[in-house]
Amino acid sequence: MNESKRKLMIAGMTVASVGLFFSMARPGLAQPSDTALIAKAKLIHARVLKLDTHNDIDTANFTPDCNYTMRLTTQVNLPKMIEGGMDVSFMIVYVGQGPLTPEGFGGAYRQAIAKFDAVHRLTEKIAPDQIGLALTPADVLALHKKNLRIAVIGIENGYPIGNDIKRVKEFYDRGGRYMSLAHNGNSQLADSNTGETEGYLYNNGLSPLGRDVIAEMNRLGMMVDLSHPSKGANMEAIRLSKAPVIASHSGVRALADVSRNMDDEQLLALKKNGGVIQVVGFASYVKTDSKERIEALAKLREEFGLAPQGGRGGRGGFGGGRGRGDEVTNRACPVESASGPPTQGGGRGAGRGRGNAGLDALSAERRAEYEKRLAEIDAKFPPAGRATVKDFVNHIDYAVKLIGIDHVGISSDFDGGGGVEGWNSAAEAFNVTQELVRRGYTEEQIGKLWSGNLLRVWGEVEEVSQKLRKERR
C-alpha cells in the first residue's frame, strides 16, 4: 500500500490512537453517564474529519453582498459549519428535470453553469481565506491542515449535459466530482426512482448514452451517484462501473419504504462494488407512516371525493428550496436574526401528511364525518411523527449491520431537505456524533462514517481513472 493511499484510508479517523482513550461499549458493561458520554463525543467530534456529501445551493446566496460568510437562514453556511464543527460540504449543482428537447437542455446547462460559477466565486473571490475548493481527496486533507473549510462540487442530475457527452469532461474540469444520471423524472441518461412509483420507465434502466456516460465518468475520475435513479438504473450502473460508486444521499428502504431509498439488494450490490451509501438526514426518507395508514388515508379521501394526498409527507413541491438557476432575483438577503425562527428545511417538506387537504370543499356535516373517520385512523394507525437523530442513526445501524462499516457514510440533503429533529442544520452536527457514541461506535468507526469511507472511495475512483487513461494511450 503506497503512502498516499494509506493517508486516505485513515482520513477522518482519529489523530491519536483510538484504543488508548476509548473502547467500544459492549453489552453487559456499565455505560458512561450522560456527562461522560458528551465529553467523549466532543473529543471525537473535534478529532474526526466531518464531511457532508449533499448540500443544495441558491446562486442568490453567492454574491458579494449576500453570501455564506454570513449567518443566513440556510441550513449550511460558514458560521453554521464552524459552529457544528463541519469541515467539508459537497455543494450541489442541481437542475430539476425538464423536457428532453434542445431548449430544455439549453436552459438546464445555463442553470448548471451558474451554480458551478457560484461555488468558484465563494472559494476564489468572496472567502478564499475561509474556504477552499477541493478537486481531489488529497486537496481535502491539505485544506483541512490549513484550518480552512472545504467545498467540493457534486452534480445532481445529468440532464444538463444534454446529448453531448463532451460536457461530462467540461463539468469535471469545472470541479464536478460526482454526478447522478437522473433526478425526479426520467432523464435522457437514466430512469428516475419516481418512474417506479408512477409506473413509467422511459429507458428501462440506463439509456445507451447513459452507459457511455458512466464509462466516461470512470475514465475521468468522477464518482457515479446512485441517489435518485431507479433501482433498475442503479443495478445496471453498478454492473457497468469499473470504479466504486456512491449513493450521495439515500436512506434504507427497509426502514422507510420510499422509492428514493435503497433496498437490501441494491445495498448488497453496492458493497460488492466497493462503494458507499451516504445515509441521508432528510426526514421524509428517515421516517414514514405505515403502509396501513397510507392505504387507509387514501381510501378515506377517495370515499369523500378528495384528491389523493400522500400520507408520507414531503413529496410536494420538489422545486422549492433547491436553489435558483441562471437568474439571481432581487430579494432581501436571508440573514438569520438572533430572535428569528429556527432554520427550516427545503421546500420539499419533511412532515407527515395527515390527509386533511381539500376539506373546504366538504359540507360541515361531511367534514365532521371525515374528521371522525380520520380520528379513528389516527387511533388505529398513529402518524409516524417527526424524525429524530435516533431515527436517522437507525438507518446507519441497519446499513452497517447489512453491508459493513466500510460502506456507510453520512449526508444531510440540507437546503433541499432536512427536517430531522436535532440535526436540521450544519450547526447541529455534533448531535449525530453524540448519538453514534451512545450506540457504541468507536472513534475509528465514526471517522469512517463521517468521511473516511467516502474519501477512500473517491481515491479508488481516481486510481481507476489513472489506470483507464494509461490503457487508452
Which positions does each model-derived feature cover?
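His/Asp/Glu-rich metal/cofactor-coordinating catalytic motifs and the adjacent surface-exposed loops
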Residues: R239-H249, R253-L255, R260-N261
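Alpha-helix-loop-beta-strand connector modules within alpha/beta enzyme cores
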Residues: Y202-M217, A237-A247
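Bacterial N-terminal signal peptides that target proteins for export
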Residues: N2-T14
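N-terminal hydrophobic targeting/anchoring segments and the immediately downstream early-domain regions
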Residues: G19-N203, R253, D257-R473
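Active-site-adjacent beta->alpha loops and helix N-cap segments on the catalytic face
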Residues: S187-G195, G205-L206, S230-L240
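Histidine-centered divalent metal-coordination motifs
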Residues: H54-D56, H228, H249
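Substrate-binding cleft of carbohydrate-active enzyme catalytic domains
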Residues: D212-L226, G232-E236, L270-K271, N394, ...
